[in-house]
Amino acid sequence: MSRAGASLYEVFNIKKPTTGQQTGIEGRVLSFNYYESIYSPMITARLMIEDTGGTIESENGVLGTIKDSMKITGFEEVSFKIVTGNGDLDFTDYPLIVTGSPATKDEPNRQTTVLNLVSKTEMISSSKPLSRNYPEAPISETVTKILNKELKISEDKLDIEKTQNQDKIKGNHLGALDCVLKMCKKSIPADYKDPGYFFFETQDGFKFKSINGLIDEGIKQFEDVDYEYEHTYYYFGALLANLDKNPDRDPNDYKVLLPPMVRRDEDQLQALRNGLYNVRIITKNALTGEYKEVIKNLLSDTNLGEKQQKPVTDEVYFKTYAFHINPGEDDPGVSDKILNNPANYVPQANMRYSLLHSQVVQIQVPCNVQLRAGQVIRLLLENITQGNKVEHVYNELRSGFYMICHLSHVFTPKNSYTSLTLLRDTRELYTSKK
């Protein structure tokens, strides 16, 4: 099966939980778009179906379209299993939920309907706001407790990276997923110095991971030969030759289909103004009156390419952060304890998120359901040169490791492809540990 060709809808059902009414729509799907993002705590999808009105009976026994006869208004379950050239996209045991039908086109003999879908956990989270507060504890422990106890997510569907800092978390009548999302910027990983987490859902489950943790884990995965093969993509003008003569592996399944689109590139002036290198941090302790002013270097030591370099000296800064610290504000009675000082994470987290988005590139590749948001892929771009291209095949400045920010699998009756938005903090083909 060609990875860019049509995929097989082995299962595609819509079920109305209130009535138990269910119907298969395998032959009626015009398009199906599946989405993951490191900025989204939920999987989303968009389904377009075409119906001629002879699919299912209404309550009165009259044949009609799926939307009208089943009264599709929201909360319906859509389960599916899509067979592709390199694996299955299987949501038969974890159906997505219809949130609404934003567009419907009626013609004399057919109806075209668009359905927006989200993961079931998001619907549960939004219908059960948190009213309780969680006591001081490591943030990662509280996140695990919220997801496991409040949303009943099993441990095997959770990938939570340990945090070194503690905090009290207030529900504030937010949905559980939204409450966890608010903790990302405050979280400092146990094994790295840079704060900044992402909380997101993939087809494997939920992840609460630091930026540096995702980078290190993603690059380490390339030690596995099969993983490296499935996560390396090439952009060349010509077709790729199958040099290893493996009939099960066509290198053109890993060829970027369209020219990579650079959506953002490094802007050093903006980096200086945003405090990407050095910042001044001012703190005033309301209890003791102590005033501190320091210039801090925010360079990260974990990168997708070469090590981050700064073009300014240590005493130069272009951005100032000021914090008024109130010890004991979260404790009853009198206390001088400072809990999770924002001066320790706000400037650094802003830097880390900004640095990761220094380069934003969009590519389209043949469908690969082995890819996940948050994974690291290797992108090898053809070198543009009038010199010796045999010795310098790849563009060593722009080729290298990239992190998947947004992922979309698109399925139509004729084609299947995956669109990726990639992020990168530094350049060069090879990573440096210096």
Where are these regions (language model features)?
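Assembly/oligomerization scaffold segments
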Residues: 1-127
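Envelope-exposed proteins and targeting segments
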Residues: 10, 28, 41-45, 92-94, ...
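An acidic/polar, Gly/Ser/Thr-rich interaction patch typically located in mid-to-C-terminal regions
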Residues: 35-69, 227-434
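Glycine-rich, acidic and aromatic/proline-enriched surface loops and short helix-turn segments
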Residues: 111-112, 118-122, 136-157
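Short beta-strand-centered interaction patches in the first periplasmic/extracellular domains
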Residues: 112-115, 119-121, 159-253, 258, ...
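Second-shell loop/turn segments in exported
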Residues: 127-136, 165-171, 360
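Sec-exported extracytoplasmic/periplasmic mature domains
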Residues: 147-152, 184-189, 379
